[in-house]
Amino acid sequence: MDLADLVDPAHTALCVVECQNGVVGPASSIPAVAAAVADADLLARLGTLAAVARSVGVRVVHCTFRSREDLWGGNRNSRLFAAARKSEVQQVEGTAAVEPVAELGFDADVDVVVSRSHGLSAASGTQLIPLLRNESVATVVVVGVSLNVAVPNTVFDLVNAGFQVVVPTDGSVATDADYGNRVLEHTLAHVSTLTDVTTLAGVWQR
């Protein structure tokens, strides 16, 4: 399928995974991820892509993580979750940590926030898939952090749910850049359509 047809604004949504202050901002619970984001200048690129998406009617969905202040109900079953629980920065609901970073130009009038409090995927056990289906979305563009865990998990769940998924290769990072490139080449390329932010924005602006 031609990329322009695949990402037609009439049936496409842009999902931005965990680009929130407490993850990719200066005060991060995962400093290595925040550093990778800064080194790649990722937020500026995603801010541009989100602005283009809004301008053509593509819904921007911010997929965030949040927890209760007492962390009740959160996962304890992996090293990743254990490290997050020990961090001085917590993604507590109602705090600045769970808000989308300013670079994304969050627009409360049109953007959507879908939060989760458990798991590794923005799509599993959240409202994301039902909301997309209710709006007749067929294609989901997935960007954000990170290629280590959350982005691949989200892509897999969306593909399993029957959506076409598009992944801009410069729209995500991993804590090891070479590893991120391997995930894109050897895994996500087989289950999604790879492109880049500039090409995607150009298609939307035609």
What are these regions (language model features)?
Residues M1-A13, V52-V56, F81-R206:
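Active-site-adjacent betaalpha module
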Residues C15-C19:
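N-terminal nucleotide-binding beta1-loop-alpha1 segment
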Residues Q20-G25:
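Short acidic, Gly/Ser-rich segments with clustered Asp/Glu that frequently serve as metal-coordination loops
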Residues S28, W72-R76, G180:
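Short aromatic-enriched loop/helix-cap "lid" or pocket-rim segments at secondary-structure transitions
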Residues S29-A38:
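Short glycine-enriched, charge-decorated loop/helix-capping segments at active-site entrances
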Residues D41-R59:
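A short, N-terminal amphipathic alpha-helix
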Residues V58-F65, P168:
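Short beta-strand segments at enzyme active-site cores
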Residues L71-R85:
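Aromatic- and acidic-residue-enriched segments that line the glycan-binding/catalytic groove
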